[in-house]
Amino acid sequence: MRAVGLHEDVIAVTSRAYATGCVLVRSGAEAFCIDSPVFPDELEALPALAEQAGFTVVGRLAPHADWDHLLAAYAFPDAPLGAGETTAARLINEPGDAQRLMREFDDEFYVTRPRPLSLSGTQQLPVPGHVEIGERSLELHPADGHTADGTAVWVPWARVLIAGDYLSPVEIP
């Protein structure tokens, strides 16, 4: 796992799995974890990385409902999960799919997780829309294409766009 500061309020974290990433975003005393790394050791290290950088994670955001974007629950189990309307609908309409696909990945790569993945209580967010963080707000924009339920997050004060799977140095077959 690699972490890079993009701005004093933004840290990009890249997983060993497919070079996927997550982004920690802070405003004042609050921070969100957007997306997630994949492997258990990366998820276990994420809270310490956030704390060391002064990011108190109070919420999680999922850019879409693919299993590898929902794993921040392992790192921040007490932080509620927010997702765009279409992502929340996909989680409701495809119950257990994310967990099943995660188990298939784990079986193939001999990954052991500390507990089952829980996605209950997902907060549905309007897209396009805003979500408050500290004294500021993040902009949520529709980003269908890779999936029908994609959401991109714009961090206006840092001028950072979090695009989920749309930008990657790795081509996944």
Describe the role of every protein-language-model region.
Residues 1-53, 57, 116-173:
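Catalytic core of the metallo-beta-lactamase
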Residues 43-44, 48-126, 130:
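Active-site HxH/HxHxD metal-binding segment of metal-dependent hydrolases
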